[in-house]
């Protein structure tokens, strides 16, 4: 090559023309990705052309020597927040610290601060993002030289990031300025996320004040049951509210359309519904049973407290259902919720099958809510393909009252 450019119109599809000293071939085309041939007129074929990966993911060809037991000819390198073979699954959903889907017993810490003569417990279960109140976060003991707080997710999940927030204690801002993240599959042996190029444990940047949010996404998603945050530098005290981001390992746990109203009202029905003081204007209709629904009448309430009552969702077509989130509500100050329930499913809305664990003879009873507002998430060990889903209350507090979301794909 002479290194000089020539008329690029000689090369098609955006190719760059370079002069060549060979008289047989006076110019050479540098073809853009996806094109080949003397004048870039042929579409390049191969496992990565066209790119099979979604969401701007990079496609990398695997050569035969390194393929081993991997039968695909390529892998997709997913950008932050995506997962799946083709990076088609969004994996940065809040895992439940803020909503209460992660229960108090799942959160533990090395220590906690006891304030105001020991009456104020800055306990680990308070470390929930945006939690309000005077005592509204976790604070490590002043005497704890190696503080940490951890979450047991109860099963292996894909964890892709963390959102941290400080709090105000005794009128002063306290927060975590830098921290490490450790993880474990068994709760005994922990490893730290590593920095780039063997630089040791990765140090994450934390907060700058007591109320702002700091999002840190992990370079490589974790597939773990336990996640531990380890403060390194704190402002005044090691005080923390936080949320974990990620998704189920299956990737099939997206909301199926109750909360966002993609399931229309007519597809949400029930055995009956309650009218406060018998007035139609004060009806707790089935289609109010949408997770986090707001308003004075914001949930489904059954007419009677009976195990024969049910709430039914028609998904419109057959879907793979992998889990459920339930929530109670409040009726003029009275806290109401379903404390335990069964799940049934049907393809035609007539013939029903109660969900049961593998090998079980009876329908599984799922633990429900403990209050009117927290989320309670239950995942099905054996997901099912269905169109119709029924929730069958077994135990309740005050009245049978439900807000709900189904999960799946």
Curated annotation (Swiss-Prot):
Renumbered to this chain, motif Cell attachment site spans 67-69
Q: Please report any disulfide bonds recorded for this protein chain, giving both cysteine positions.
A: 6-17, 11-29, 31-40, 48-59, 53-76, 78-87, 91-247, 234-238, 252-409
Main site of residence?
A: membrane
Tissues and organs where the protein is expressed, per its UniProt entry? Mammary epithelial cell surfaces and spermatozoan. Also present in testis, epididymis, uterus, adrenal gland, tonsil, muscle, heart, lymphatic gland, thymus and kidney but not spleen, liver, lung or brain.
* Superkingdom assignment: Eukaryota
Instruction: Give GO terms for biological process.
Output: angiogenesis; cell adhesion; single fertilization
**Gene Ontology terms, cellular component aspect?**
acrosomal membrane; extracellular region
Q: Which Gene3D superfamilies did the record assign?
A: Galactose-binding domain-like, Laminin
Q: InterPro entries from the entry?
A: EGF-like_dom, FA58C, Galactose-bd-like_sf, Neuropilin_MCO_CoagFactor
Any idea which UniProt keywords this protein has?
A: Angiogenesis, Cell adhesion, Cytoplasmic vesicle, Disulfide bond, EGF-like domain, Fertilization, Glycoprotein, Membrane, Repeat, Secreted
- Which Pfam families does this entry report, sorted A to Z? EGF, F5_F8_type_C
Question: Where does this polypeptide localize?
Answer: Membrane; Secreted; Cytoplasmic vesicle, Secretory vesicle, Acrosome membrane
Glycan-carrying positions: 41, 372
Q: What sequence ranges are listed for the domain EGF-like?
A: 2-41, 44-88
Presence of keyword Transcription: no
Annotated F5/8 type C domain ranges read 91-247, 252-409
Q: How does it sit in the membrane?
A: Peripheral membrane protein
SMART domains assigned:
EGF, FA58C
* Functional summary from the UniProt entry: Contributes to phagocytic removal of apoptotic cells in many tissues. Plays an important role in the maintenance of intestinal epithelial homeostasis and the promotion of mucosal healing. Promotes VEGF-dependent neovascularization. Specific ligand for the alpha-v/beta-3 and alpha-v/beta-5 receptors. Also binds to phosphatidylserine-enriched cell surfaces in a receptor-independent manner. Zona pellucida-binding protein which may play a role in gamete interaction.
- Swiss-Prot/TrEMBL domain comment: The F5/8 type C 2 domain mediates high-affinity binding to phosphatidylserine-containing membranes.
Return the protein name. Lactadherin
């Amino acid at each position: 090559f002479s290194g000089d450019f020539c008329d690029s119109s000689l090369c098609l599809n955006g190719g760059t023309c370079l002069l060549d000293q060979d008289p047989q071939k006076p110019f050479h085309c540098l073809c853009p990705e996806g094109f080949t041939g003397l004048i870039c007129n042929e579409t390049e074929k191969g496992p990565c052309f066209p790119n099979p990966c979604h969401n701007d993911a990079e496609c990398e060809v695997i050569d035969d020597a390194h393929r081993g037991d991997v039968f695909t000819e390529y892998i997709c390198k997913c950008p932050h927040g995506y997962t799946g073979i083709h990076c088609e699954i969004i994996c940065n959903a809040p895992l439940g610290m803020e909503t209460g889907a992660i229960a108090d017993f799942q959160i533990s810490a090395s220590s906690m601060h006891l304030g105001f003569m020991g009456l104020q417990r800055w306990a680990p279960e308070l470390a929930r993002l945006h939690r309000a109140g005077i005592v509204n976060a976790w604070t490590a003991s002043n005497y704890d030289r190696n503080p940490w707080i951890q979450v047991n997710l109860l099963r292996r999940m894909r964890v892709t990031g963390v959102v941290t927030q400080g709090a105000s204690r005794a009128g002063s801002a306290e927060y975590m300025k830098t921290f490490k993240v450790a993880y474990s599959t068994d709760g005994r042996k922990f490893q730290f996320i590593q920095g780039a190029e063997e630089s040791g444990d990765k140090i994450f940047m934390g907060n700058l004040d007591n109320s702002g949010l700091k999002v840190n996404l992990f370079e490589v998603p974790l597939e773990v049951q336990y996640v531990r945050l380890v403060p390194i530098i704190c402002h005044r005290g090691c005080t923390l509210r936080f949320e974990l981001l990620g998704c189920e390992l299956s990737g099939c746990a997206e909301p199926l359309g109750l909360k966002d109203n993609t399931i229309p009202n007519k597809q949400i029905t029930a055995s009956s519904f309650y009218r406060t003081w018998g007035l139609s204007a004060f009806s707790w209709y089935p289609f109010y049973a949408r997770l986090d629904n707001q308003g004075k009448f914001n949930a489904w309430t059954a007419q009677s407290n009976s195990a024969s009552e049910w709430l039914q969702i028609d998904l419109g077509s057959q879907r793979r259902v992998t889990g459920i989130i339930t929530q109670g509500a409040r009726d003029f100050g009275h806290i109401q919720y379903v404390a335990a329930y069964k799940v049934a499913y049907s393809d035609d809305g007539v013939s029903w099958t109660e969900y049961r664990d593998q090998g079980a003879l009876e329908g599984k009873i799922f633990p429900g809510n403990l209050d009117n507002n927290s989320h309670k998430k239950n995942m099905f060990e054996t997901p099912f393909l269905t169109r119709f889903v029924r929730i069958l209350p077994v135990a309740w507090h005050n009245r049978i009252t439900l807000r709900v979301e189904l999960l799946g794909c």
